[in-house]
């Protein structure tokens, strides 16, 4: 959507498709959050008893505002009022960033969870969200490539160039994600107490090397190879496979960080 409003009109159809996907997926996100909390029927307390000093309260506010801004953006976008859509898109951009970063921000305040208490945690969740989101955009573009554009070789040729640009964004974000994972591994090696706890989890069978290396190899390194290899860099099928693997990797890597931290003893 950002490219679509930087005078790159070739991205506009993809921006419309992506914006619709955001709203549909966002409709399911609050339900998953409610299922995860211990007392879902009391979620309204976050609104009725709003505490400005609480990160959770601000996160709830952001999650509520974001779909509203997205709906207004979509309204102007599909009406062809691009300038108004651009304004609402720019207003919604920091809200979108906050909606993904606040999860890690809240976790970083959990001082009893040694794996989460770092300033890198919000950045990790933000980068992972950007990576999986861009991967979803590539999947949507692949669907468009093989459906609405299949009868137009010229349009498909132009779309392959878009695939290439999206792929460049993907592997930049993959490198960023790998760097943050490396930080977590360095923290593990440089914190004797944390290392001992993780080693105990592995010896008890609650955690294994495969839990880390499967999402790391299949979800990040394999897609990176597909995105940088000359033969596959502009191939829509390769991009589709890489994007599906990225979403798999981001999900399981995030789940690993959450579950591993909860399995460790409180400090």
Regions found by a protein language model. Name each.
Residues 6-15, 63-64, 69-241, 247-248:
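Long, contiguous internal "core" modules enriched in hydrophobic/ aromatic residues
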